[in-house]
Amino acid sequence: MVLGSLSCDKCKKGRYRGQSTQGSKAKVWGWEQSCQACPSGKYSNQEGLATCDDCAKGKYQTSCEAGSSDGFAGYAGCRQCKNCPKGWYQDGNAQDDCKHCAIGTYNDLTAQKQSSSCKACPNGYSAGSTGSPSCDACIPGQLTTTSGAFSDKKQCYNCPAGFSAVGHGSTSCAGCGSGKISGAGESSCSSCTAGRTPNSDSTACVDCTSGKFESNNVCQDCPEGNLII
């Protein structure tokens, strides 16, 4: 458009003018600045719009990004809304950000529209921060479960002393076998050294008492006529 023209040019994509000029630029010098950028949470993907459209659920638009269009200063970020990233969702329209999944849950898809898209981590996994796109497998010696003391998927929990979990992503702990012990959070059980046996709950090794010796992980009385050496 040139000065003195009787016609108006349409506002570019990502901008709007308002109802007074029906989406066109003003007829005076400086008309290019009369088209405004869409506000946060809105966009325009057509020219000549009097208003901007709301971002749909699952999407957002924070601010307009600088760019260029047909030789004019443009607003590329206002031409479309962005998908909420993995680990996030948006259940409202015309929003300028997304809502994060809570600790212990995850969401592995973009543009999600409901809080129900955030799913609890499976057993043997946890999500220790908000907005998680995936869950982390519990390390050996730790676990999570469906119910009970280890069901909080916000973190993985140590197997109690006397138990162990060998692999990653464990959902249960196994009790130490005969003659073996473990501390809390251990991936395997260990044998007691000679002359010592496991205590009753397999959490520590204890010395055989005076007059007894260890044989096959059991403290036994020394036979009459024999000495402990």
What is the predicted function of each stretch?
Residues 1-229:
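Disulfide-rich, cysteine-dense extracellular ectodomains and adjacent flexible linkers of secreted
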